[in-house]
Amino acid sequence: MEIVCEDFQKALTKIKLLRENANIIEETVQRSVREIVQNVRESRDEALSFYTKKFDGVEIKDVRVSEEEIKQASMFVESSFLEALQEAKKNIISYHEKQKRQSMFDCTSKGIIRGQIIRPLENIGVYVPGGTASYPSSVLMNVLPAKLAGVKKIVMVTPPRAGGIDPHILVAASLAGVDEIYMIGGAQAIAALAYGTESIPKVDKIVGPGNLYVALAKREVYGIVNIDMIAGPSEIVVIADETGNAKYIAADLLSQAEHDERATAICITTNIELAKEVEKEIERQLETLPRSEIARESINRNGAIFIVPSIDEALQLSNEIAPEHLELHIKEPMNALAYVKHAGSIFLGPYAPEPLGDYLAGPNHVLPTSGTARFFSPLSVDDFVKKSSFLSYTEEALRDVKHHIVELANKEGLHAHARSIQIRFGEEE
């Protein structure tokens, strides 16, 4: 892992290059995704069968997982896993319940009524990855906020394996309250949710992380359906001063690096000795890490340790990066929170490591990546509702303001708008 001693602008340039390298998208992949989406739109289940056999090596007669399979899944998971899942569910619900908002009703003078109605989406699709790792936690993080919002129907898709779907995924789906589960993955699953097929219902919104093909497919169908966000590779920035623990920092950097080779792991520190210790510790921990090949490739391609003169500059650099995850291993981390402008999720102190947020604490782990934390937010209950405004005026109330409306409408050249007001008072031209 490279240790970089640069001024602010040079450090920022290097970091941007790391991110660009992580987000390079082959044009051939984009073309392939576009073709898959179009074929599923046109051929529906026939295309799903073709791509499932091609990409997953599995022939499936019925893509829907039966209720019996879901019930039997609990026989194949550990009691300790169920206990952990229940604890995570409790914390996720308690956190997200506080995000729920009420409809607004505002009654002003002269009988003017204005308001906003908040309603849940009717149905959503949740994508759960099934590649080099299985993610039951993603089921909870995507489904529970939707349930709290009041979504009527939740459909889940996840790639099939030779032996079926990982029972841990099925148990998590059952616990979270998923209504239907389908054995389908990749760009073809996103297309099926967006357009509908003979077997899979069309939904109003698609959420959930996935690989590059899934992310590009979500971009392709956006507008046909809504999506949560277009997630890029996982990323973490750790800011540390001389109080930082090299073992903790190295472990936290590797916790993101093991996701995939395109993940980004960056440490920004004011202490050169700590930087050297972190570098050594990463090498030591990689030797015993089961996913060391993936993590090492990620660290070599997209990892770095930056030396800066002050924590203030470290925070400025982090704000320019706008990372998915930001850890603060510094004295008085709570005092620095006010200076963090852009980050998906912020972890304060040595005992709030990023995996705590990934699995158990309650805040959502579906976060903006690739700098989009500047304008996107973590997944929340708000993502599963829509809002309608309403208003009611009395004749007297409209009469009082009609001249303003007519003036504005005529100024914009929209004379039918003006007439719509005037005709109610016998003033049409």
Curated annotation (Swiss-Prot):
Active site location: 324-325
UniProt signal peptide: none
Cofactor comment text: Binds 1 zinc ion per subunit.
Known EC number: 1.1.1.23
GO molecular function, one term: NAD binding
Cofactor(s), by name: Zn(2+)
Class of this enzyme: oxidoreductase
Protein keywords: Amino-acid biosynthesis, Histidine biosynthesis, Metal-binding, NAD, Oxidoreductase, Zinc
Binding residues annotated for substrate, in chain numbering: 234, 256, 259, 325, 358, 412, 417
InterPro entries: Ald_DH/histidinol_DH, Histidinol_DH_CS, Histidinol_DH_monofunct, Hstdl_DH
Reaction catalysed by this enzyme: L-histidinol + 2 NAD(+) + H2O = L-histidine + 2 NADH + 3 H(+)
PROSITE patterns attached to this UniProt entry: HISOL_DEHYDROGENASE
Positions with a binding annotation for Zn(2+): 256, 259, 358, 417
Entry GO CC: cytosol
Pathway(s) per entry: Amino-acid biosynthesis; L-histidine biosynthesis; L-histidine from 5-phospho-alpha-D-ribose 1-diphosphate: step 9/9
NCBIfam families the record matches: hisD
Family under the similarity heading: Belongs to the histidinol dehydrogenase family.
Functional description taken from the UniProt entry: Catalyzes the sequential NAD-dependent oxidations of L-histidinol to L-histidinaldehyde and then to L-histidine.
Identification of the protein by name: Histidinol dehydrogenase
Organism whose genome encodes this protein: Bacillus cereus (strain ZK / E33L)
High-level lineage: Bacteria, Bacillati, Bacillota, Bacilli, Bacillales
Chain's gene name: hisD
